[in-house]
Amino acid sequence: MNYIELKHYLKNAEAIDDFLINNGVKKLDIDNSKNSFINYYEEYLNYYDFKIVKKDLVKVDTSYIKTPARTNNQNHSWYELLYRCIHGDSYKSKANISDHRLLKLLTNLTKMSLEDLKNLYQDGKSNLSLYDFNVFYRDGQPPIYIGINDGTHRIIMAKILGIDYVYTDNVQVYEYNKFKHDVFKEMKKAIKVFKDFLNQSEVFKLSADSTHIKVDVNINSYTCIDQFFYDVSPLDFNKNVESYREYIYFLHFYLKVFKEVEDAYKNSFNVYKHLPLRLLEFMLDSSSNFHLQNIYKHKSEFLRHVFY
């Protein structure tokens, strides 16, 4: 049976689960593949340090494998990736797999026993058995293997069939760095707190591109030249964690300044709720932009004019 015939058969004659069970796959393994969801652990590259590339042949328990090599399959179960090859993917977000490649692998069950297929997956020699991985180690926790390079469809099928282990002779090893993780968490929290403030502020707003801060008063809008928020590259964060500690201080410092301005604005007499442009001269640098430092340097003067 070729993959086209198998797809038609599974779509019209026999349910996928029945086909798998009738060919020796345990129901428990099928259920596990339905309840195990792909997670790329993309944050890990921020605070796990690269150590070494190992080329020795190593056995890998498939329960430690959390993703196939191809990206954009996040939050799908392993089973769903097979299901959508047969029944279509309109019921959920798109996946990054090739239907015919996955189904061609499934046709092996029509040509050999599950036991023979498992032996190929677990012999450490065949194409079905060898994979490349990133592995993340943290004391007291199981290792996490992330597929890289190729082998996407082979490892999906291995997870569905209940293959116990595969092998790797190319694994990039990463180790947990608690200090970097703490800084990363602190940065995320500082960004969230600042953005929550901006969402409810009457004076300060986030720019359309979510990177700069604006002052909106009356019908006028002024954009801060200094950039506040960035797309953080894991590689950059991991190598320059000290500079991100300075960034956290920057966020804390100016959040305090902005809150003082905001509080003064809210507590001023109503007539000052619509500030005349001359009061903004303390912070504005041009007709449409201002420097962040001007808010801090002239904060007391600005606040005094808000009140009087």
Where do the model's predicted regions map?
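A short, basic-hydrophobic beta/loop patch
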Residues: 126-186
